């Protein structure tokens, strides 16, 4: 399925905004992203296996924080990272 990667994580994807990944759940998709792009998962998931507070994930335009969210092959996943500034 198509995954949109936020600009602050594109160093892990060779600069690509759109990447392919597979998984029956959001957790499996993130594990596949990690396999394809080592180091990216830790930037999104904390030590307690929860989505980091500054990361938002949308599946077919619906926000989710549940790693058990079921996915289908034609779903679109958008990962958004909050930007900070001062």
Label each PLM-derived region with a short phrase:
Residues 1-85:
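Ubiquitin-like/PB1-type beta-grasp interaction modules and other compact soluble beta-rich domains
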